[in-house]
């Protein structure tokens, strides 16, 4: 086992000197080379279920409603948890790679996969009873039946997520983003004809769309596994050390639970937003408009999400390597990219505010309402990009617990109450609800900015070093 690097920087360079030295420019190139492919990977992964929803929706309004309801429920109750838990691997695998503890990267990945499987079993039990659960919550029985059947056929896809999500973090920690991109694009191209065949050629309707998702994600698992198994790039890192297995599982949950809380609390807030919109006057209009805003914000988020993944990787690698100065510069580089992308996309959205609604609806009322909410949506673009980058810093550094507490305070103690008050008491309706989202994001951004500015980078690097050299892999 190779010994991790000792701390290599006696003193951190002041920010002013960092800018003058050109370190930020160098790091910008490195962060960008990771961020662009990761954004494309995220888009491709996002499109897989979207394509199935689109194909299934052409079978009728009932099918579309049922599939949309099932997609929302399964995202909240299952997929969000697995994606959240994977944040632990950004800390552990990234720091292990920086510390040249290559065999730990594979062991962490195997441990995460093994930990995900029993979680998927529990989630599957819930999904089996989705139809009855939705009916008990007052949903239309026909829509609930379609949603329940669709969710049932998504269970294999859930188990596929237990494998491919750790594999993607395994590759990301090593900076192997281009192979990851090629595998993801191959899966997307595979999914399109498979989805069409299951829905139309085999006549399986909405169930066929769910089956296609499951088949495609397992195809994704197979090609990712083949790359990891046979690529020379993974010779050192695919090793499994059985003696570290139990301690790696403990570390995975130590960082994974707060990481999952970070993700789930944010995902759940937006589902709560849609539910609240159904209680407003003219619920069809309010729900439609807020769904359009949410979809637009989600599509934009893949860009700062890619930057966040890149920053997380660079921060974790450099902390593990004992080079805190470069870790700090990575944060500055990520924020530079955020400034550029948020300025561009918020300006583009505002310029297109009067036509963006037509991409989703032909109703003039809906289009005008979306245009009215666009300034708030632009603010969301700016704040979401900022918080995404700083959440990436949190995952790379290993302080997910702070991020989770921050989300509770920002969204549930501030944002949600403000949104409900403005929507119902001040009668701002959907605009009021989205104001609550913006306020919550602003509070989240302020707290994250304060925490990030207060980071003792040498101390974080020392924690990463101790985590890697600990003979028993005890929790840091």
From Swiss-Prot:
What InterPro entries does the annotation carry?
A: MATE_euk, MATE_fam
Query: What's a BP term from Gene Ontology annotated to this protein?
Result: xenobiotic detoxification by transmembrane export across the plasma membrane
Single GO cellular component annotation?
A: membrane
Keyword annotations from UniProtKB, A to Z: Membrane, Transmembrane, Transmembrane helix, Transport
Do the record's keywords include NAD? no
Q: Which domain of life is it from?
A: Eukaryota
Q: Does the keyword Transmembrane helix apply?
A: yes
Q: Where in the cell is it found?
A: Membrane
Q: Which family does it belong to?
A: Belongs to the multi antimicrobial extrusion (MATE) (TC 2.A.66.1) family.
Q: What is this protein called?
A: Protein DETOXIFICATION 3
Q: What gene name is given for the protein in this entry?
A: DTX3
